[in-house]
């Protein structure tokens, strides 16, 4: 009777080991399949503008990736808010005035900064934080993320993250891919670093130095394309 009992224990142990091994194999296969199904295709963010101040068409691929990874491009069409965002790669002498206007009108904004901006305009970054604005990650060197490995992306993102935290005790949570270029892989990976991707639903050519200083044109473009829960992108590097 004792021999039979020992035999059953041995058989049961073997079965448990077998079942556990199969579970681990299946789990690994599922992880590999999931990782391999993430697209590496480079995408340049773009939108199709709508008329009558309606929300634009983000495009099916853009929308799917943003929704899947809980990013932000625009909000609920029934909410009358806008997201005001600025990309700050370098300082051209206009940010202080922009901050003054925002403060005067009690308007919060988000500024996406690079390491160069942090190192050369840290006083303005401090002012942004002190006045209640959000600071976002625009990476260390403003490189196109689809060109980078995950390890390189981690360095580009987290080196800046650490520098901002050490300098201001401020933890960034939002990232804007440099040049508006991304892939599903890069968005998925930056998610694992604790970041939400922020894109936009309105932009115009304010970055072109040859087209700057056109106040009437700028107002017309903005007012004609404003829509509920719009996400505006502009820069602090041109004369308005």
Question: Which residue stretches match the model-derived regions?
Answer:
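Loop/helix-junction capping segments adjacent to catalytic residues or to phosphate/diphosphate-binding pockets
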Residues: 92-93, 118-122, 147, 184, ...
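Second-shell loop/turn segments in exported
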Residues: 84-85, 89, 113-114, 142-151, ...
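Hydrophobic packing within well-folded, soluble alpha/beta domains
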Residues: 111, 128, 135-138, 153, ...
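Alpha-helical scaffold elements lining the catalytic groove of polysaccharide deacetylases
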Residues: 94, 143-170, 181-228
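Acidic (Asp/Glu)-rich catalytic clusters
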Residues: 75, 98-106, 118-138, 190-192, ...
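Structural recognition of the beta-strand scaffold that forms the well-ordered cores
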Residues: 82-85, 109-113, 134-137, 173-177, ...
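N-terminal pre-catalytic segment of deacetylase/amide-hydrolase enzymes
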Residues: 2-85, 91-104
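Generic structural signal for well-ordered alpha-helices
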Residues: 69-70, 99, 122-126, 157-161, ...
